[in-house]
Amino acid sequence: MLTIVMGAPCSGKSTYIREHAAPGDIVIDFDVLAQALGSPDPHDHSKAIRMVAIDMRRTAIASAIQQHANGATVWIVDINPGERMPAYRRAGAQFVTMTATPAELHARASAERPERWHGLINEHLVREAKAAAPTPSRRRNRNASGTC
């Protein structure tokens, strides 16, 4: 099983995986990787650690998808899967989207995260709203004969 857990920052993605993953499952969570690299804080990492964690995560995701094909159970936290979606779909991933109101997200950020997380939440919500907005369709005018 390959499960991609998505949602805004502070929506409960890591908590969901902690509650559902079994011992021995592969779990890819950026903050966990950053802490493994030496970050003293679970949610506030130096630039150097962030850069290494980004590279590690990219490699880990590709490897985990291959291990999933070999029968491993894989959980991936992915706030913004974008370009990775086709690979996830080809691998037969299931998707879980964590939701919370903006007020809940900001309350959690105030309780557990550095101040800059409020901006990250707002950026995510704007990106999500743009993705959900209907796109205007183009209309073609035809004359009575059906030609343009």
Regions found by a protein language model. Name each.
Residues 5:
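Hydrophobic anchor at the beta1->P-loop junction of P-loop NTPases
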Residues 22-90:
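Conserved nucleotide-sensing/catalytic segment adjacent to the nucleotide-binding pocket
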Residues 12-13:
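Conserved glycine(s) of the Walker
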Residues 19:
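Active-site signature of alpha/beta-hydrolase-fold catalytic machinery across serine-
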Residues 16:
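Hydrophobic positions on the alpha1 helix immediately C-terminal to the Walker A/P-loop
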Residues 2:
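Walker A (P-loop) ATP-phosphate-binding motif of ABC ATPase nucleotide-binding domains
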Residues 8-9:
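The conserved Walker
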